[in-house]
Amino acid sequence: LAGGSACPTSFRDTVHDFGRTTLVEAVKRALSVVGFTSVLDSDELVSTGRRKEDLQIHDCSPVLLVEVKGIAGMPTEHDAIQVGKYLAPRMKEWGRTDVGGVSIINHQRNVPGLDRSLSPFTDVVLTNAIDQQFGLMTTWDLFRLVRNFLQLGWKPDDVQPLFYRHGRMEAVPVHYEYVGLIEKYFEKVGVVGIRVVEAAVQQGDRIAYELPIDYIEQEVESLQAERRAVATAAAGVLAGVKTNLTKEQARTGVRVFRIKTRATR
């Protein structure tokens, strides 16, 4: 997995210099970093029949089958949905139906991470993933999750539930609640105008700005709407929030999230 100029150049290096030699090993180590404690390499297990998935996650129900693929271009339908073909055989072999899957694709592996397509999966693949009940993730997503997990002190239960979702899995932790987008930036006063689309924002909340690689978290110390101080900015409002973001960071279209507290989850 190639990163941007500020990042290491391979996936094996990005996840805290793990020193592993294969993509599967790097993914396995990344999963352990976010708190999974029972990640098994299928090649090391005794199993009947032909080779199946690369990894298995046995931390809780359902068991997750993880298929890892590295490809030079964009993933084909076969590449992306292969893990779905392993579900029924494993259910039969293990005599249980609580088996899910995750397909982790290192697409455009020779391209720097920041230059890769953010939409590598076709509509057909996305539909199949939902219908067959497995998740789709890129190694760039996984890298971003691990990097921010380490930098921002996220907890395992902020990230692990993502792997049990079906369809496209974004690099957005579960304790982030979508607010809206940056629409304006007032450089002289250090204020961003956030168009609130979903979750309301209150003074005293913590919010996160999604940059190309990292998230920047901060407290909402002051909040304005229609040029006056308010306690809450609801959907539809252009909320003015004091920020430490630079002009380069506070670009139009940057996604903003409200950080849910433990008590409100």
Predicted stretch roles:
Residues 10-171:
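Catalytic core segments in nucleotide and nucleic-acid processing enzymes
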Residues 1-12:
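Long, non-membrane, amphipathic alpha-helices that form coiled-coils
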Residues 174-265:
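Beta-strand/loop-dominated core regions that host nucleotide or nucleotide-derived cofactor-binding catalytic loops
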Residues 1, 31, 110, 198, ...:
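Polar low-complexity intrinsically disordered regions
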